[in-house]
Amino acid sequence: MKRKIYDQLVSWKQDGAGRTALLIDGARRVGKSYVAEEFAKAEYKSYLLIDFNRVGDEVKDLFLHYLNDLDTLFMYLSGYYNVKLYEHESLIIFDEVQMFPRARAAIKYLVADGRYDYLETGSLMSIRKNVKDIVIPSEERHIKMYPMDFEEFLWAMGNDTLMDIVRKRFEAHKSMGQVMHRRAMDYFRQYLIVGGMPQAVQEYAESKDFDRVDRIKRDILTLYRADIVKHATGYEMKVESIFDEIPAQLQKHEKRFKLSSLKKEARFREYEDALFWLDDAMIANICYNSTEPNIGLKLNMDRMTLKCYMGDTGLLISHAFDENGLVSEEIYKKLLFDKLEAVSYTHLRA
């Protein structure tokens, strides 16, 4: 599927490759590995992908023993993966680089060598947890990757023109007309329900089956819960309690996240690390109140008053109806026709 971040990769290849490695970081399952490999296939003569989530010790040992002998390192990597490497025409991808921080530290020497280009991918939560024993290379350029936006969703649905029409009418301050507006809102409601996680979008584009889409989204939510337990060491219970409370807080009129809903007399300082972790992992978007809305928003940020959103609207839908096991086709259809009150009634009755 077409992703806007691809153009940023091309710009890096033209302007920064050879002087920096590119690190794509973001939440799990947003499509980092996919776009990295598609970029490599289209823009390079050859590429070598090392998935540190799956690779064995025999490959990891190469980075431990041959950083002072890069000729031998490249020879072994080329032979192990059966990929011929061409100087200045090949890309080496470190996928899930957070699983082996020593490879990330090696970027300094690999970029200085200059023979090949380097692209790293990793989930933000893990990368920041696994840097304490390495020197973070200054030769990295960071870009963040998010779930698919509305325009990318339209592309996946085979509609390449609607967003251009919306944009032009908006810039001209003119109405789209009832027919086009109705069509745009229909697509937009589909996007809000399905969300922007690539696997869910692809399934919906192919099958239009909400049950299958919901199963995919629930698998991602399960993965996020496992990550919380594994990586939010020391305050995982607080992270999980905030995560579970997000749908209920957003259902309220003001949508402000009240820590008292988690524990009576709860204080912000008790949950500050947990909120930061969710935001840092890009599982949630934390929105703080600004007491003086101007250019310097951070200068007037009230950290005690906040709203907590999910990083993806489709995941929010599945998360909100979590106790039902699966969101039924009936609920999805009511959401599609903007009947949220009917959905709430059906949910409470069940």
Annotate each PLM feature.
Residues 58-81:
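Short glycine-rich substrate-engagement loop in P-loop NTPases that contacts/grips substrate
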